[in-house]
């Protein structure tokens, strides 16, 4: 027994196959974050994972309380035909309770496969009706146009996770306050019941739509206007049985989240600086705020109900694939609620590689694998279930994190001073499969970069679709695997136009980065080869030809970047930069009304739709 039993790897292998040792000091710090010195073994978890048809022996008699409420008296092996779900086994001799998770083990196949769709940063997809950023009304419009006129079957959006309920607003959708709830900034105010009765609605609408003239998205300005409008609607809200029923169905999680929002408005967004009585969800100030600020507490619950309703309406137009971020802001709602199962002194990142010689730290605290298991995985279950709400599919960002994560001590001199920590991936994948089965949704694992061989094998066995990018693949699209999503690029990588024109290389220099001229040259050669074009071909021709090549991929799902189709040269995010680049703030160059009539998106859609219909 020792360090390896706690999942901490004392060595790691880079992309070139070279092994590196982790310092004993780093190992000790990582173990300390788990509350151990590495002696002995982690305590057993309270959950038993079962697959249909698998005999599970049982000593003595017990009552099996099914999730639906029925109770079965069992002696000997558990029944092999248990329904999928979360059940509870209560032993008759000592009353000991064990969670029994019955999972199908594999995720559903995409119903419409093969099909295609747009990958879009929703905030960037503004229409003339938007208030400075794309919203759920825009998603509904984009989905209707894509499915009814273009023949597409999905829209992949950036994470819609909840941001902090205060100013300033975070620009990054991958650094949320909570992954269990969603961002009210995406609400279409005019679609909220009661909005037409506002006396100053017209002036608010005009001010909101004027924000569309700004070259970059100003979330703080959007927040101020939408908060003003929504608070006025709430003041006139007299109740709705549908809201009451929805609140009841959400359980304690919604109330705890709303309490965090009220406390954040009172004490500031970082709970670690709050008064001691509010610093833990069980603190006396938390119960007090639910009583003394009942109206404000309900207001934040109402906002989540509105988001849920508008997202449901948008999802009725097309299957929406929701993106699950790797983690959360440690100062936010999930960090507060789950502080006992998160390693708050650690940050998720990546070891050194050819792109980042010192490694990367993303500032997101990881789950402690053993405390998470000890909690019956409920935080993870809630996170997956929430992201699957009104979803046709689930994109798991950095899916390798279900197997292992690079933990960086916040005291480390650089991200290179970290270590890999392994997770109980079988349990986590069983939960993903069960939740996807319940939601009728497929799963896609973003498995780009350095990936252990067994990871892709296990994901394939679980029917989690792989990710294939033209930018990363040496093989032509026609040779990609079937069980995958294929695309040209992502939000962190150059667009076709940016690469082809050379503007992305110039942007790297503008952002203060070391321009990767050789890497750009190689990527451009790959693009030329895949698209089958001459080196001086017009960028519009290159874009269409590239997606025609992508259409030959046998993959179940294909996605096209809407910014790619419009010839956008700037990528949404420049990794390694902060204020040097307008990360997550670049809108599409045309409103959706213009997108619908522009030739580029129709040409790309026609190329991909031919594959889906052939």
Question: Model-derived features: where do they sit?
Answer:
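Conserved, mostly hydrophobic/aromatic
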Residues: 3, 87, 146, 260, ...
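Acidic/aromatic-lined carbohydrate-recognition and catalytic surfaces
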Residues: 28, 32-39, 47-59, 65-69, ...
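Hydrophobic faces of well-ordered beta-strands that scaffold small-molecule active sites
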Residues: 116-120, 153-157, 320-322, 394, ...
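Short, solvent-exposed turn/loop segments enriched in Gly/Ser/Thr/Pro and often Arg
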Residues: 156-167, 324-329, 397-403, 446-449, ...
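Active-site-adjacent "subsite" loops/lids of carbohydrate-active enzymes
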Residues: 184-185, 190, 330-378
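Conserved alpha/beta catalytic core and glycan-binding cleft of carbohydrate-active enzymes
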Residues: 239-242, 447-569
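Active-site-proximal helices and loops of the catalytic beta/alpha 8
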Residues: 327, 331-354, 406-509
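Low-complexity, glycine/alanine/valine/leucine- and proline-rich hydrophobic stretches
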Residues: 566-601
């Amino acid at each position: 027994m020792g360090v390896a039993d706690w999942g901490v790897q004392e060595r790691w292998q880079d992309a070139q196959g070279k092994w590196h040792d982790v310092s004993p000091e780093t190992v000790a710090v990582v173990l300390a974050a788990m509350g151990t010195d590495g002696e002995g073994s982690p305590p057993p978890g309270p959950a038993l994972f079962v697959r249909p048809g698998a005999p599970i022996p049982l000593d003595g008699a017990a009552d099996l309380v099914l999730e639906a409420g029925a109770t079965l008296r069992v002696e000997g092996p558990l029944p092999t035909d248990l329904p999928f779900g979360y059940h509870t086994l209560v032993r008759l001799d000592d009353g000991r309770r064990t969670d029994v998770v019955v999972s199908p083990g594999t995720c559903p196949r995409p119903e419409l496969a093969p099909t295609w769709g747009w990958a879009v940063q929703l905030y960037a997809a503004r229409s003339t009706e938007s208030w400075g950023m794309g919203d759920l009304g825009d998603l509904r419009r984009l989905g209707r146009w894509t499915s009814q006129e273009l023949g597409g079957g999905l829209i992949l959006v950036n994470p819609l996770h909840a941001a902090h309920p205060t100013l300033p607003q975070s620009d990054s959708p991958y650094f949320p306050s909570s992954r269990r709830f969603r961002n009210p900034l995406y609400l279409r105010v005019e679609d909220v019941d009661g909005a037409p009765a506002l006396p100053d609605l017209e002036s608010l609408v005009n001010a909101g739509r004027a924000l569309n003239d700004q070259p970059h998205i100003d979330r703080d300005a959007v927040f101020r206007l939408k908060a003003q409008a929504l608070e006025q609607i709430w003041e006139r809200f007299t109740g709705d049985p549908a809201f009451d029923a929805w609140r009841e169905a959400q359980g304690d999680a919604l109330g705890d989240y709303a309490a965090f929002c009220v406390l954040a408005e009172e004490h500031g967004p970082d709970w670690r600086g709050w008064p001691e009585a509010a610093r833990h969800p069980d603190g006396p100030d938390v119960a007090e705020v639910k009583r003394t600020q009942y109206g404000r507490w309900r207001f934040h619950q109402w906002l989540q109900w509105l988001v849920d309703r508008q997202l449901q309406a948008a999802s009725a137009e097309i299957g929406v694939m929701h993106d699950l971020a790797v983690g959360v802001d440690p100062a936010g709602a999930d960090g507060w609620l789950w502080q006992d199962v998160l390693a708050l002194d650690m940050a998720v990142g990546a070891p050194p590689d050819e792109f980042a010689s010192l490694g990367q730290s993303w500032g997101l605290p990881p789950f402690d694998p053993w405390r998470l298991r000890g909690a019956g995985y409920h935080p993870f279950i809630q996170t997956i279930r929430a992201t699957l709400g009104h979803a046709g599919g689930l994109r798991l960002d950095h899916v390798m994190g279900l197997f292992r994560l690079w933990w960086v001590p916040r005291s480390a001199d650089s991200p290179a001073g970290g270590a890999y920590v392994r997770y109980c991936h079988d349990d986590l994948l069983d939960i993903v499969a069960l939740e996807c089965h319940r939601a009728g949704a497929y799963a896609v694992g973003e498995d780009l970069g350095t990936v252990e061989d067994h990871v892709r094998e296990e994901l394939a066995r679980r029917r989690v679709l792989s990710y294939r990018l033209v930018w990363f693949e040496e093989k032509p699209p026609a040779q990609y695997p079937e069980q995958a999503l294929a695309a040209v690029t992502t939000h962190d990588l150059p667009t076709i136009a940016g690469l082809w024109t050379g503007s992305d290389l110039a942007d790297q220099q503008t952002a203060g980065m070391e321009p990767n001229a050789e890497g750009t040259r190689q990527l451009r050669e790959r693009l030329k080869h895949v698209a089958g074009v001459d080196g001086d071909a017009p960028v519009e021709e290159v874009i269409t030809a590239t997606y025609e090549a992508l259409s030959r991929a046998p993959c179940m799902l294909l996605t096209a970047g809407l910014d790619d189709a419009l010839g956008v040269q700037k990528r949404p995010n420049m990794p390694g930069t902060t204020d040097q680049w307008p990360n997550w703030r670049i809108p599409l160059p045309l409103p959706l009304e213009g997108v619908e009539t522009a030739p580029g998106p129709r040409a790309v859609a026609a190329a991909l739709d031919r594959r889906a219909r052939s």
